Each structure stands twice: as C-alpha cells, then as structure tokens.
Amino acid sequence: MSGIFNSELDSILEGTSRSFYLSLKELPRAIRPQVSLLYMLARTSDTIADSEGGEPKELLEALESYDDFTQGRSSDAPALSSFSQFQTNKSEGLLLKNVETVVSRIEGFSDSDQEAIRSCLGIIISGQILDLNRFSLAEEDLASIEKNDELDDYAYRVAGSVGEFWTRMSLTHLFKLDSEKEKELFEKGIRFGKSLQMINILRDIPSDLALGRCYIPRKSLEEHKLSPQDLLDKSKMESFRPLYDEYLDLTSKYLESAIQYIEMIPHSQFRLRGSCMLPVIIGKRTVSLLRGRNVLDRKDRIKIDRSEIKEVVKQVVMAVPFKGSSKRLLRD
C-alpha cells in the first residue's frame, strides 16, 4: 500500500480507514489511488460533520466551505485546524490539518477521473449536510428520519454513491461490459454500498440515539406502536424486533445484490473480486449476529472481532483464484 501518495498521507489513510483499509490495499493498482483518495476526501467531510467541538451552524458552514473547495468553486481552503484538536482519532485530526494537500491530489488524475471523484464526493457531502440539518439543527432532543424514502435517499448519498463510483472506476480502468450488463452492474453496485450503510445504521442504534439521531423512520416506528424515544429502553427490543428484522431482511437483499455484483466481475480480476468479497462476508456475519441480539442494549456492542476478520482475509485469499471456492465462501 505504500507509495500511493506519500508516507504521511498513506499513514493517515491507514489510520482513518480502519477495516475498510483491508479492501483498499487489495484493490488493483489502476484504481487504488482514486478510490483511496475519495475515501480520504469523504472521511474529511465526515470528520467535519461529526466534530464534537463545534456548534451545528459552524459545522455546517465548514462543510459547505469544504464542498466549495473540493469542487473548485473556491480557491480558499476551509479553516479546519480548530476542529482537529477535538478528534479522538489522531489520524482524523491530521486529516483535517492536511486538507489542502489531500484535495490537491485530485488534479493528479485524468479529467474523467477528477469528474467522477468530485461528483461522488459532492453526493456524499450533500447527504452529510442533510444529516446536519435534520439532526443537529433540530429543536427536539431526539430527532428522527420520517419515512423509508428518506432513509433510502440517505443510504444512497453516503454509501450507494460510493458503489456507483467504484463501478465507474472499474469499468473505466479494468474491464468492459455491454450496455445492458453495465447498467445492471451499476444498480447492484449502488445496492452493495447501501448494504454496508444499513449495517452501520442497524448496528449503531444506541450510539446514534445518544447523539440525538434516530435513523429508524418515525412512520415505521409508529406503525409498530413505537416512538424514537422507546428505542432508548433496551426492554423494548421484543416490541421492536419485528420492524428491526424487516430492515435486516432489506439489508440481506442488498447483500445478495452485492454477491451478484462480485459474480459479474471477470474471474481474472482477482484483486478486485477479493477486495469486494471482504466487506460482504464480514457484513453477512454481522447481520447474523444482529438477528439474535438486543441491539438496543448499549453495553452489548455487536462487532466482528479482529481474529475473525483476519481469518476471513485468509479465506478470501485462498478462495479468490477459484470460482467454486469463491461462490461457496460468499454464499456460505
């Protein structure tokens, strides 16, 4: 992975990408820098949006300023150093301090790649701005998404769009498909991205509630005679379970699309298939864990441990050269 940008930026990338770094480092060289840079750019905006040291309006202004800077609408870099001191993750603080250096890397790519990076980043930031307006500027202490369409829109903006970008980079630099198959791959790529965001949402309900954010739509809760406030009470899990299972089922459908996405990638693209397999397998195992646990219990955080992740990496490396082994591992 070394040598993508420079030692400092590569270190920041590894420090901020956590488990996603496992996929980034397996990507083919032809698209690894573009995807890695988009990740760093999106991680910067996410860090701004989630900074605990700023008032909501300050964060919104900083996010909009960052958006203008990355899109080339402004030549003035946003002043983010004041937010860097509040980051518990040292690498995220360094990311904010190095915003000019990171953004300048966009111009190192072809015009079409620059356009793709900026387009996807703009969509992601639009989702983060919506999030800030919806939650941080809300009058109530616990604000909620209202309906399923809003949840789907959010999942597309912050994650489905990344699947779209990933697909565009792959089709531009790695392999070609006919127009019908290309359209299908884009659709499945969007669902792939949404699946990973839905897992985050369904796993992190207690921590989001603690921040005054409820991503489970209010109307869906009301249909089950529940409110966002009810989700603060872990004893409400059995009442919440039927609705929660509906969202897990939706996530599983998205993961099935992700598997189909991988199966559409040419077999010879070992690195690309392997980098896609990792989050899908980990995602499927996370969904299985979520089905049997009380997700409303803040003390019972559901997480795949590092030893199991390392084992998954080994399994993928062993399986990816073989069609049968890859299929069994994905569909096990």
Give the predicted meaning of each segment:
Residues M1-S195, P206-D332:
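Catalytic cores of Mg2+-dependent Asp-rich isoprenoid enzymes
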Residues N200-I201:
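Short, contiguous alpha-helical
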